[in-house]
C-alpha cells in the first residue's frame, strides 16, 4: 500500500495447532442436566441422581421413568430336550455376550408386538404378537423394566437357518441354565428351565 500503514490481522492457528489455554472450551453435554421444557439448567439438586426434578425457572417437574424392554422366551424342541433361543450380541452393551432376543419397546408399540419384532430383528424367526403371553416383568438398577414374553414352543426343524443380523451373530439354542450377558436374562431363563414360565 503506497504511503499508508500496512496492518496485519492477528495470527491464525493452523490445523493441528493446540488451542490457547484461555480460549473458551466447548461445553461437555451432561444428560438430564437441563429442563426439557424451557432449557434452563437444573440448579440446587441435592445429588446428581435426584429425581423427580423441578425447574426453578419454569416450574415444570420432570420424572425419570424406566425404559421398557421387550424380551422373547422362545422354547425350541430339540432332538433330545427343549431349550430357549438365545443370540450372541455384536453391539454394546455386552458385545460378544449371549442373551435372550430383546430390545427397547418403541413409542406407542404394544409390548407383545415388540417381543415379536425384536425376535424377528435379532434372529430372523417370525412370531405372531397374539401368540405372546406375559411370563414375567423385572426391573434392574439402571432404570430398565424388562417385560418377558413367552411364545409357544416350536420344533428346531421348523426354524429358519441361523444367520447374522445387524445386532447379532445369529441365534443358538440354550439347553440348560447358565449365566447370560444380562442378569435379568439369566434370572428369566433359569425360571423357565425351573418350570415357572411354562
Task: Enumerate the predicted regions with their spans.
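Conserved Nudix-box catalytic region and its N-terminal flanking loop in Nudix hydrolases
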Residues: 76-121
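A broadly conserved sequence feature marking short terminus-proximal activation segments
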Residues: 2-31, 134-135, 195-198
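Beta-strand scaffold of nucleotide-dependent catalytic cores
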Residues: 71, 84-88, 148
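Acidic, metal-coordinating catalytic segment for phosphate/diphosphate chemistry
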Residues: 24-72
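Conserved hydrophobic "DFG−1" position in protein kinase catalytic cores
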Residues: 74-75, 86, 151, 173
